């Protein structure tokens, strides 16, 4: 047995203490000389400055080899040729490599589990593992890579029992929760599976077994993280990769130093020895403390092994459960895949006949398990059946929730589309439709479809398949959608009414402004004295027309809103918005009327009616004797008085602006930001916009008024000059003696023309044509065409004569012309080469 180690029951020598001491032997006896060993290794006087590490794992997995290479100890290792147990009981030795590690590290080598020497007697391995867990700061779990994910191979079954008893014996009555570190060292790691994946698998397994253990009453909700931290490391194969193994072991050794937690992510900073792991037992009292722990473990009856009957029942029930779950998977997995695909695409998909399929698959699985497993241990059977039903129900619950979510989403979309379609159909038909009736009908239809789907998913005896809360939630959302659709329809109604208001105002306001152009006396407008109603009361009439139009629009809106079952608050908000938008429409129409071109035209018409027509409305024919200047001055000044009148929206009766804030009213309660975002600010009402009521009522600014006066005066001056020229032009006449002389000297010619019918008719036609051409301003173009035709004819004649002389030998000799080298064709005279006077243009001028 371990050479140079002090065994239980013998008085050790210094040489035997050299490599450690056997704390507990294979017969479960505690060694009372542990304190002597601590004194001889100078650990007893270290106080709290020491650390205890234990190793845990299956037999012959290299636990002792790991400790020897890591801490420089000399625990006995297995002979490869014999493959038998080497470590018996629990041995302890002090770390020999303190250069890169913390001081006073005590290492306990625990007998391996699942050894053939003890066979089915697992009592000692459980108790030794529990002792190591209860006393050590760090418990190294030594496993091979291929054991990760196994239940027995990874010692998960043993850890489950150890966790449960440790919780009951040592933690249930303590106010604080002592923590330990489970340090998993994964041996023979080849790297195909990343360490992070192995870590996730182990953490999931540990969490699962922790959730399944029996906990004391005060610790039902305790989590494994409340008592344990986890660390992980991987080592290569010692035989196949010896150099890499040594390097990784050295790197692993650097982690066994003091450390602390990060304040941000609670990860280790420094080493693995955290202060909360220490049991706070002085080193000189550790031996007594450990002996008490071992005594409590040995004498505890809760550590007895379960009966073989229970083990058999557990094995068979697990096996049967896997078989029935396979059949359950065949029915449910395709449905889960379809639902997942629809969720990935973002499209709601209601699985057909999900309720019947799920009920059938679940009932078949439960019945098959009952038939095969009910003959085994009743307690185990009942527990395993509950586990089986829990697994199936958890999957069905997720599937059902996805189904109802899809039905919910599809139902809401269908409801919205149906209501919108019915409203559009009513609008296209031109008839009236009741929005509230449409909503109520479609809502009942949609709720019936959802209720039918939810009832189809119900499974008898399972309370969680009662989906009344989901139904109420669906109904609530339909109400919200109904409210939103009603609000949208109210907005559309308001838009239609606003368009009607704009149309009415456009005609009515335009008519009132057109009256400004009717200033002639025949219309009843005197040139002096009080202004007629068509001018002085302009704004009164506009305000009266505006109020009447908006009142009618409000009645239309309120009457139509009743069919929507809109609340009085919603109607009041709609009327308030309508009044605001109507005023903005009026201002826009007024601004359009007083645009520079429009208002100047109306002022000119007003002036001309007063200037060109007399008191009876008869057009004036100006004579040099008329008082043109006086009439012009009175008409101009009368028209100029309209500009101040138009510059401000002011009632003649009160000589003040209308009470716009009172007419629009205060903002009703319940107005949301969406109701205000499309509203134009109004001066005197929206004070935060910085525009006063006086500015709101100003139609023409001072600069525009002055500019309008200047432009109008120029226009009026032009009319005056035209009238003056017309009066003076009538004074230019042909003398009478000229006509007498013309008639006397031309009598013979006149009589000749009259007596000759041909000349007389030609004279009439020429005179008539000349008169028409003169009135149509065609005399100039006709003269140009005649001149062009004459010039063209002259050019063509010259060209033809030249060709004749060139081609005729006799004529050429008579004129002594030289023979021509040009072809007979010559240069052609074309109409498109003539200028406006009929002259031939040079080709260079045409750019050819």
Curated annotation (Swiss-Prot):
Membrane topology field: Multi-pass membrane protein
Comp. bias regions, Basic and acidic residues: 829-848
GO molecular function: GTP binding; GTPase activity
Primary localization class, coarse: endoplasmic reticulum
Stretches assigned to the GB1/RHD3-type G domain: 47-277
Topological region Lumenal: 755-757
Residues in compartment: Cytoplasmic: 1-733, 779-848
Residues the entry annotates as binding GTP: 57-64
Ranges for region Disordered: 815-848
A GO CC term assigned to this protein in UniProt: endoplasmic reticulum membrane
Cell compartments where the protein resides: Endoplasmic reticulum membrane
Transmembrane segments: 734-754, 758-778
Enzyme class: hydrolase
Pfam families recorded: RHD3_GTPase, Sey1_3HB
SUPFAM superfamilies tied to this protein: P-loop containing nucleoside triphosphate hydrolases (SSF52540)
Listed EC numbers: 3.6.5.-
GO biological process: endoplasmic reticulum membrane fusion
Family, similarity comment: Belongs to the TRAFAC class dynamin-like GTPase superfamily. GB1/RHD3 GTPase family. RHD3 subfamily.
Function of the molecule: Cooperates with the reticulon proteins and tubule-shaping DP1 family proteins to generate and maintain the structure of the tubular endoplasmic reticulum network. Has GTPase activity, which is required for its function in ER organization.
Protein name (database record): Protein SEY1
Organism: Pyricularia oryzae (strain 70-15 / ATCC MYA-4617 / FGSC 8958) (Rice blast fungus)
Gene that produces this protein: SEY1
């Amino acid at each position: 047995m371990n050479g140079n180690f002090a065994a239980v029951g013998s008085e050790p020598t210094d040489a035997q203490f050299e490599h450690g001491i056997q704390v507990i032997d294979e017969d479960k006896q505690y060694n009372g000389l542990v304190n002597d060993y601590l004194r001889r290794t100078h650990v007893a006087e270290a106080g709290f400055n020491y650390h205890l590490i234990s190793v845990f794992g299956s037999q012959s997995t290299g636990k002792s080899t790991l400790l020897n290479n890591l801490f420089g100890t000399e625990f006995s290792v297995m002979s490869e040729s014999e493959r038998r147990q080497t470590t018996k009981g629990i041995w302890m030795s002090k770390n020999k490599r303190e250069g890169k590690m913390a001081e006073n590290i005590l290492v306990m080598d625990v007998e391996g589990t699942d050894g053939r020497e003890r066979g089915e007697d697992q009592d000692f391995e459980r108790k030794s593992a529990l002792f190591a867990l209860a006393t050590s700061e760090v418990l190294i779990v030594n496993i091979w890579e291929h054991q990760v994910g196994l239940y027995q191979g990874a010692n998960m079954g043993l850890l489950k029992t150890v966790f449960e008893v440790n919780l009951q014996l040592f933690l249930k009555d303590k106010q604080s929760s002592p923590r330990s570190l489970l340090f998993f060292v994964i041996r023979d790691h080849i790297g195909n599976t990343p360490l992070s994946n192995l870590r996730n698998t182990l953490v999931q397994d540990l969490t699962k077994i922790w959730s399944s253990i029996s906990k004391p009453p005060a610790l039902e909700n305790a989590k494994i993280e409340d008592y344990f931290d986890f660390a992980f490391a991987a080592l290569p194969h010692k035989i196949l990769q010896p150099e890499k193994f040594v390097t990784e072991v050295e790197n692993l050794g650097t982690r066994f130093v003091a450390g602390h937690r990060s304040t941000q992510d609670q990860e280790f900073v420094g080493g693995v020895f955290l202060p909360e792991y220490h049991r706070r037992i002085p080193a000189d009292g550790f031996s007594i403390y450990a002996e008490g722990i071992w005594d409590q473990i040995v004498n505890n009856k809760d550590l007895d092994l379960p009966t073989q009957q229970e083990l058999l029942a557990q094995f068979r029930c697990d096996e049967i459960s896997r078989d029935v779950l396979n059949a359950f998977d065949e029915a449910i997995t395709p449905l889960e895949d379809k639902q997942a695909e629809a969720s990935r695409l973002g499209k709601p998909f209601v699985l057909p006949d999900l309720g019947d399929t799920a009920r059938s698959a679940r009932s078949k699985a439960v019945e098959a398990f009952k038939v095969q497993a009910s003959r085994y241990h009743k307690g185990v059977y009942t527990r395993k059946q509950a586990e089986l039903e829990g697994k199936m129900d958890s999957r069905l619950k997720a599937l059902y929730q996805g189904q109802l979510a899809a039905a919910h989403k599809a139902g809401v979309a269908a409801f919205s589309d149906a209501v919108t379609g019915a409203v559009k159909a009513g609008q296209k038909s031109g008839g009236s439709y009741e929005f509230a009736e449409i909503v109520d009908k479609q809502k009942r239809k949609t709720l019936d479809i959802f209720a039918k789907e939810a009832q189809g998913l119900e499974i008898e005896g399972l309370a969680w398949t009662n989906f009344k809360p989901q139904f109420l939630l669906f109904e609530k959302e339909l109400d919200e959608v109904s409210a939103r659709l009603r609000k949208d329809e109210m907005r559309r109604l308001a838009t239609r009414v606003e368009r009607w208001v704009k149309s009415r105002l456009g005609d009515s306001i335009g008519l009132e402004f057109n009256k400004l152009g009717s200033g002639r006396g025949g219309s009843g407008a005197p040139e002096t004295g009080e202004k007629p109603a068509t001018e002085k009361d302009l704004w009164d009439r506009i305000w009266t027309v505006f109020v009447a139009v908006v009142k009618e629009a409000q009645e239309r809106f309120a009457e139509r809103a009743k069919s929507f079952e809109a609340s009085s608050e919603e109607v009041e908000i709609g009327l308030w918005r309508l009044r605001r938008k109507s005023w903005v429409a009026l201002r826009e129409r007024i601004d359009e009327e007083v645009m520079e071109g429009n208002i100047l035209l109306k002022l000119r018409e007003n002036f001309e009616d007063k200037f060109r027509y007399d008191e009876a409305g008869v057009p004036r024919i100006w004579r040099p004797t008329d008082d043109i200047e006086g009439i012009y001055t009175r008409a101009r000044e009368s028209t100029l008085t309209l500009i101040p009148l138009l510059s401000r929206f002011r009632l003649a009766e009160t000589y003040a602006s209308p009470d716009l804030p009172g007419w629009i009213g205060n903002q009703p309660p319940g107005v949301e930001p969406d109701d205000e975002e499309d509203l134009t600010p109004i001066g005197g009402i929206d004070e935060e916009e910085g525009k006063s009521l006086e500015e709101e009522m100003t139609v023409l600014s001072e600069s525009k008024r002055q500019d309008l006066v200047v432009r109008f005066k120029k226009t009026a001056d032009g009319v005056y000059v035209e009238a003056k020229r017309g009066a003076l032009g009538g004074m230019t006449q042909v003398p009478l003696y000229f006509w007498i002389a013309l008639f006397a000297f031309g009598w013979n010619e006149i009589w000749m023309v009259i007596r000759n019918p041909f000349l007389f008719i030609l004279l009439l036609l020429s005179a008539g044509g000349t008169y028409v051409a003169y009135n149509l301003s065609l005399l100039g173009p006709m003269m140009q065409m005649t001149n062009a035709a004459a010039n063209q004819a002259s050019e063509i004649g010259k060209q033809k004569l030249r060709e004749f002389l060139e081609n005729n030998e006799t004529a050429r000799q008579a004129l002594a012309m030289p023979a021509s080298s040009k072809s007979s064709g010559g240069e052609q005279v074309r109409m498109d080469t003539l200028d406006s006077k009929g002259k031939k243009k040079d080709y260079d001028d045409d750019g050819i």
